[in-house]
């Protein structure tokens, strides 16, 4: 079970991934929770660079890809050991943020993602959709990833991906309550994996 959570900052994805991890663990599932960028020792160093330093859009993409490649090795191992792997951001983030947000192009980012991940695709992705205004209010601050026009392009990128991959990407209305969104997440996970819990 490989599940990713996507959305612009302030969408509530990090809250939902924690709630799903708790839900699965209470029911005896082995769960590993990771985030991007980061998730490995070197990946966390890359995360620090991305969050604290100004880099070009292409350099930003390659740093994300390097972090992702390191993490995929661990993810494959966890999956082979029967863990449910829950990941806060993955390839869809690069397509949305770098492909659409930074205008590097959807196709090139998808090709590079495929190369960096050896083609590892999540079984299920939850995209928590909120409008940019709501997300910015929730965050209460702007960093360089969160300029309004940029986030509008990112959001559009996510919506394009959701339309292209409806079998994998479930769009959830992020304006609803945390509990309502969690119920939908659990319902979908139970449906996909025929869980009786």
Curated annotation (Swiss-Prot):
One of its GO terms (molecular function) is ATP binding. One of its GO terms (biological process) is dTDP biosynthetic process. It comes from the Bacteria. Pfam families: Thymidylate_kin. It catalyses: dTMP + ATP = dTDP + ADP. GO terms for cellular component: cytoplasm; cytosol. Keywords: ATP-binding, Kinase, Nucleotide biosynthesis, Nucleotide-binding, Transferase. SUPFAM superfamilies: P-loop containing nucleoside triphosphate hydrolases (SSF52540). Gene3D superfamilies: P-loop containing nucleotide triphosphate hydrolases. Phosphorylation of dTMP to form dTDP in both de novo and salvage pathways of dTTP synthesis. Belongs to the thymidylate kinase family. This is Thymidylate kinase. It comes from Thermotoga maritima (strain ATCC 43589 / DSM 3109 / JCM 10099 / NBRC 100826 / MSB8).
């Amino acid at each position: 079970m490989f599940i990713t959570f996507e959305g612009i900052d302030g969408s509530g994805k990090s809250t939902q991934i924690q709630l799903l991890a708790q839900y699965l663990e209470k029911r005896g599932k082995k769960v590993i929770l990771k985030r991007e960028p980061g998730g490995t020792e070197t990946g966390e160093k890359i995360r620090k660079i991305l969050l604290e330093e100004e880099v070009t859009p292409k350099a930003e993409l390659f740093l994300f890809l390097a972090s992702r490649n390191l993490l995929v090795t661990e993810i494959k191992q966890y999956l082979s050991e029967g863990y449910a792997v829950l990941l806060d951001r993955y390839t869809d983030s690069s397509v949305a943020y770098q492909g659409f947000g930074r205008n590097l192009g959807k196709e090139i980012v998808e090709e590079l993602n495929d190369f960096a991940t050896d083609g590892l695709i999540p079984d299920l992705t939850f995209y928590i959709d909120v409008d940019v205004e709501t997300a910015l209010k929730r965050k209460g601050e702007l960093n360089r990833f969160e300029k309004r026009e940029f986030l509008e392009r990112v959001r559009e990128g996510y919506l394009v991906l959701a339309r292209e991959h409806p079998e994998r990407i479930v769009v959830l209305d992020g304006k609803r309550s945390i509990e309502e969104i969690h119920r939908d997440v659990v319902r979908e996970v139970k449906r996909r994996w025929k869980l009786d819990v």
